[in-house]
């Protein structure tokens, strides 16, 4: 059964190889035009080409910078609007340290730390 599938594949592969051989003998440059070959450039032409490429690159980067300025920089905005637990904790610590002793004396319990667990329970928030 597999023998009957083999001859069409063989004929097709021979046809493809024959066509590929015909394409290799025909000149490819006439069909696609003259390709760019950097080895045939003089030194002055290569300098001009390099200068043009650098100029295009600088223009592309300038356009990208203008787009970023028009849209606004996303990095600084993201840092300002940080809502993670770590950021919120740092904000609260900063608020407590700036507010002074008034908040510490009124809102925070006096006994905090590892020694509190051995003592009796008190309601510090009343």
Curated annotation (Swiss-Prot):
It holds the Pfam family Calc_CGRP_IAPP. GO terms for molecular function: calcitonin receptor binding; hormone activity. This is Calcitonin receptor-stimulating peptide 1. Disulfide bonds join 82-87. The keyword GTP-binding does not apply. It comes from the Eukaryota. It is found in: Secreted. PROSITE patterns: CALCITONIN. The gene is CRSP1. GO terms for cellular component: extracellular space. Belongs to the calcitonin family.
């Amino acid at each position: 059964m597999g023998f009957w599938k083999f001859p069409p594949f063989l004929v097709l592969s021979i046809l493809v190889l024959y066509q590929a051989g015909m394409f290799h003998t025909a000149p490819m440059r006439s069909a696609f035009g003259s390709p760019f070959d950097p080895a045939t450039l003089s030194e002055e032409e290569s300098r001009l080409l390099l200068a043009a490429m650098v100029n295009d690159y600088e223009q592309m980067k300038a356009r990208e910078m203008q787009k970023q300025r028009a849209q606004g920089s996303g990095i600084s905005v993201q840092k300002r609007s940080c809502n993670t637990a770590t950021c919120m904790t740092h904000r609260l610590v900063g608020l407590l340290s700036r507010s002074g002793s008034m908040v510490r004396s009124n809102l925070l319990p006096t006994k905090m730390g590892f020694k509190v667990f051995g003592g009796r329970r008190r309601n510090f928030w009343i």
